[in-house]
Amino acid sequence: MSTPEATAEAVSGHEPNRAVRARFCPSPTGTPHVGLVRTALYNWVFARHNQGKLVFRIEDTDASRDSEESYQALLDALRWLGLDWDEGPEVGGEYGPYRQSERRDIYADIARRLLEAGELYESFSTPEEVEARHRAAGRDPKLGYDNADRDLTDEQKAAFRAEGRNAVLRLRMPEHDITFADLVRGEITFPAGSVPDPVLVRGNGDALYTLTNPVDDALMRITHVLRGEDLLSSTPRQIALYDALRRIGVTDFTPEFGHLPFVMGEGNKKLSKRDPQSNLFHHRDRGFLPEGLLNYLALLGWSISEDRDVFTLDEMVEAFEIGRVSSNPARFDQKKADAINSAHLRALAPDDFLERVVPYLVSGGVLPAEPTEEQLATVRAAAPLVQERLIVLSDAVGMMRFLFDGDDFAPDPASAEKALGEDARPVLEAAVSALEALPEWTTEAIEAALKESVVDGLGIKPRKAFAPVRVAVTGRTVSPPLYESMELLGREVSLRRLRAPLG
């Protein structure tokens, strides 16, 4: 395979005036991962940018690996992310059905027509026989299929069947170079003879991905195939199959292909499905916003501009160009993902933030399943104090728990050990004395009283002076702004918590 710079010649049958039809076609196996979501996002944005359509198709022909649970997880993931589709499961469309398990008759018919036209041929060689032929010829036995069955006679086929062998169906690859203009990588050439004739149909009649994927793309009139770099090696086989499908009248064009860069994990290794950060729902459960996660995943191969990392999905749709996607591997950086999400959290309107944070406070045990109006009012009042400090929504559980703990309140043991030792006693006593005398319980009054009594009165630097007060009142060394938090808690609760460590 060679990849010279892109030339003016685009080896594709796509016409500029043909309406864009992109597709997202995962297999329902395991849990949706960020690489899969990045592919879905790029296809969705590409379709929307070009006023085209996105087809959602389920490639579920492997009964040993596919599951209904994984299928539902895919639907759940796309709904949570807000990536809708124009055709596919639960939506329908003129080219359905959109689950491959419901299209077996279609594949059987196409395979029959390709076989009758001589585009496919029956192959009986076993892997052991192929390796033996390579060894006998002094070649590497791992070279793969050697195209030896291309011209079997009817008598030879009958003899194999008499032995009880079932034929697989292979595509007859062309004897010339296959060149195409990759939308991401430029012009790519696979030399003649570098790709063995692939199996399209198993001996038991089951169609393989090598047949079903291009056939569905052809029948569904897909114009652009944007997918992971790991599928680049399958492209010459698919282009050859498209040529065959054109010759038998199934389609009249070949889509354009674009292969997206790998997503790497720590240590420059490809991000594994076993890595926690690969799991989409891990990020959702932590409290990522859909728009925050999509923004970060967009950056794994593309950028809106050199000096800007934070943007909305609408802004991405407006600016997206597939030709600006990088071909270089992208590394998943959790810290940067967190920073992007935090920026989106800060941008939320107050009511929007409240609606999103309450479920995390409920699941974290801070609020009951049915919060009271008084509890919601407290969250609403505290929201401006915590929203600026959150990385993910679940951080609100630790930051806001102190507002609702009531008689069960107790400082975090590690924080108490650090800030509520014997040397904290003078600070707490001074704070209680000053605050008891306050005529008004306001943020400004609390701040002035504490600074006068502790900082000025005891001669202690503010950072050290207020650590015992913060831990006694909020239970943590890191909390929302102290004076505002005490105003929210009220005089009685604040003073009770300040007195508790004094015994």
UniProtKB/Swiss-Prot annotation:
Motif interval(s): 'KMSKS' region: 270-274
Enzyme superclass (EC): ligase
This enzyme's EC code(s): 6.1.1.17
Organism ancestry: Bacteria, Bacillati, Actinomycetota, Actinomycetes, Pseudonocardiales
Subunit relationships: Monomer.
Superkingdom of the source species: Bacteria
The keyword Iron is assigned to this record: no
Protein's name in the database: Glutamate--tRNA ligase
Keywords (A to Z) from UniProt: Aminoacyl-tRNA synthetase, ATP-binding, Cytoplasm, Ligase, Nucleotide-binding, Protein biosynthesis
Residues at which ATP binds: 273
Family classification: Belongs to the class-I aminoacyl-tRNA synthetase family. Glutamate--tRNA ligase type 1 subfamily.
Gene label: gltX
Catalytic activity: tRNA(Glu) + L-glutamate + ATP = L-glutamyl-tRNA(Glu) + AMP + diphosphate
GO cellular component: cytosol
Ranges of biased composition (kind: Basic and acidic residues): 130-148
Pfam families hit by this protein: Anticodon_2, tRNA-synt_1c
GO biological process: glutamyl-tRNA aminoacylation
Keyword Nucleotide-binding annotated: yes
SUPFAM superfamilies attached to this UniProt entry: An anticodon-binding domain of class I aminoacyl-tRNA synthetases, Nucleotidylyl transferase
Compartments it resides in: Cytoplasm
Function as written in the Swiss-Prot or TrEMBL entry: Catalyzes the attachment of glutamate to tRNA(Glu) in a two-step reaction: glutamate is first activated by ATP to form Glu-AMP and then transferred to the acceptor end of tRNA(Glu).
Motif ('HIGH' region): 26-36
